């Protein structure tokens, strides 16, 4: 499956909620979802009742779009989660949350996960003192994440927006030195991603 290259705002309208894919634009009046909060297309306003399969598929698509993960990789996360200990759905979300690009976003160094992904890909992030340019790199408790270029305009914009926002309890942030630490894996109640993970589990288990 190729990476989606169309307008991000169409994805928000398709899912019927803001996915916060465009940074500051999502918080402004310019957000297309504010003006057209219905599915894209000529007949976007029509409400169709989804089948059980449709509901599960929709939930999977929503999670993939929020985290910016393609189908092949998303399925691999599910397979890992289903083989591990604990609740499969919660474990799936933990794998997604501990991706390096997501942690960079959660630490407030990027306005969106896509922007965080670019920071990682361009070599602006180090893990335990070593530069890492793989957005999907999964962090574990005790790992230290460091921002190597503090003066980038996108980083400064993110800090101005999220500067006073508390980071999730499973992360620790040293704002002065631009370092973060993974304290532990996140609990389900600490993950604010608007998805029903059980529907995703049911989709892949059918």
UniProtKB/Swiss-Prot annotation:
UniProt keyword list: Ribonucleoprotein, Ribosomal protein, RNA-binding, rRNA-binding
Gene Ontology MF terms: rRNA binding; structural constituent of ribosome
GO cellular component: small ribosomal subunit
GO biological process: ribosomal small subunit biogenesis; translation
Paired cysteines (S-S): none
Family the UniProt entry places it in: Belongs to the universal ribosomal protein uS4 family.
Described function: One of the primary rRNA binding proteins, it binds directly to 16S rRNA where it nucleates assembly of the body of the 30S subunit. With S5 and S12 plays an important role in translational accuracy.
PANTHER family named among the record's database cross-references: 30S 40S RIBOSOMAL PROTEIN, SMALL RIBOSOMAL SUBUNIT PROTEIN US4M
Assembly, per entry: Part of the 30S ribosomal subunit. Contacts protein S5. The interaction surface between S4 and S5 is involved in control of translational fidelity.
Stated name of the protein: Small ribosomal subunit protein uS4
Species for this entry: Dictyoglomus thermophilum (strain ATCC 35947 / DSM 3960 / H-6-12)
